Amino acid sequence: MIKKENLTYGKVHQVIGPVVDVIFSESKQLPRVYDCLSVQLKKSELFLEATQLIGDDIVRCIALGPTEGLARNVKVTNYNHPIEVPVGKNVLGRMFNVLGEPIDGKEPLPKKPKLSIHRNPPAFDEQPNTVDIFETGIKVIDLLTPYVRGGKIGLFGGAGVGKTVLVQELIHNIAKEHSGLSVFAGVGERTREGNDLYYEMIQGGVIDKTVLVFGQMNEPPGARMRVALTALTMAEYFRDHDNQNVLLFIDNIFRFTQAGSEVSALLGRMPSAVGYQPTLAIEMGKLQERIASTKTGSITSVQAIYVPADDLTDPAPATTFTHLDAKTVLDRNIAALGIFPAINPLESTSRLLDPSVVGINHYKVALGVQNILQRFAELQDIIAILGIDELSDEDKIIVERARRIRNFLSQPFFVAEKFSGIAGKYVSLNDTVQSFKEILEGKHDHLPEQAFFYVGTIQEAVEKAKRLNQEFDKTK
């Protein structure tokens, strides 16, 4: 409970859309920047966040909810602390807004524990000086774009290419294989997408290990700008107090920047390049620096990134890129082939794909896979015009192996079992590297290409080939 003596009071002085000026003419103590204030409306309570001081007694605030019905001289309460949100095991399986209020219609949460959404990143001496690979159990990711524990991954993909299913599978694997937790931040999300995700997680059986936090597209920019911090605060508690490995999803990180730009314009700040806020790099840095590992736990972040007009030099995505450790690109052309996850193995990259980190064996296999797929892509035009028979014997072998590799990069997901009818597979990193190594060495050139579709390890592909041969023999 907040003690009454800690509260101070002011009055609404001016309302300009989501910007509210509050005057504290009778109070000696003014709110500090980031302090939380509230106004009691007829049917609800409106929360504000102090952003700057104007003159001797006026505080300019950003509303975290709709300001309709707000009038001058209405009483404003200053809580003398930043926004605090619930944390701990009680938040698992629940859905929240930016203020940490449940929006899933279930029972209210206990009043404690709570934490401020404005926190410092882990101290340098608390962070480990080693680089650990975060094993996802998804072959194409672990082999070609390995994730770093406590790192930041950019997820690029349009609608309908399997982004949500990939996110759900990552949540499933960290929960089942690593006993970890996941926090999902919907920043500027469409309400429909958030609703679909919630029910899909219930059906996929991963909701009990997940927290959902939404600042929807129809909400004021103040709410959309702070919702990522709300989710991050919940993830930090699991990392610091429960020593957990946490997966943090932010969809979409561009909306975080966009909301900051709107707030900056409303506050009258001079715009910077392409109309973005002058504080873009600082705001992004404050968020990204808090996503880190400590010696007892970690937060690994997967951030969906929208690129305006496909311009990678736009300040919003360009500022995000500087913080990323890996880039995962979902490709519609690969999805059209029926290969899921539809990750482009040539456009996706990771700074961890280095022999000093992953080991020389893993590095050589990954490089070999990329080289064959690159050569296969170069030969596509020749095959389309002249046909495969016009290729040299060496190129024919490359094409056949590339097709097997391309098919083998597909994988049945646990969360997709209900509509695919294929049991999900978690493939260890060692099995992944060994399987692709055998394909590169030509040990399985005699197997049909169909045997490599939607299997886990290479042993499963061999067994599937035997079944296919038996079925073929029966049809004779």
From Swiss-Prot:
It is an enzyme of class 7 (translocase). GO terms for molecular function: ATP binding; ATP hydrolysis activity; proton-transporting ATP synthase activity, rotational mechanism. ATP binds at G157, G158, A159, G160, V161, G162, K163, T164. It is a peripheral membrane protein. The keyword Nucleotide-binding applies. The keyword ATP-binding applies. It catalyses: ATP + H2O + 4 H(+)(in) = ADP + phosphate + 5 H(+)(out). Pfam families: ATP-synt_ab (PF00006), ATP-synt_ab_N (PF02874), ATP-synt_VA_C (PF22919). GO terms for cellular component: plasma membrane; proton-transporting ATP synthase complex. F-type ATPases have 2 components, CF(1) - the catalytic core - and CF(0) - the membrane proton channel. CF(1) has five subunits: alpha(3), beta(3), gamma(1), delta(1), epsilon(1). CF(0) has three main subunits: a(1), b(2) and c(9-12). The alpha and beta chains form an alternating ring which encloses part of the gamma chain. CF(1) is attached to CF(0) by a central stalk formed by the gamma and epsilon chains, while a peripheral stalk is formed by the delta and b chains. NCBIfam families: atpD. HAMAP family: ATP_synth_beta_bact (MF_01347). Produces ATP from ADP in the presence of a proton gradient across the membrane. The catalytic sites are hosted primarily by the beta subunits. This is ATP synthase subunit beta. It comes from Mycoplasma genitalium (strain ATCC 33530 / DSM 19775 / NCTC 10195 / G37).
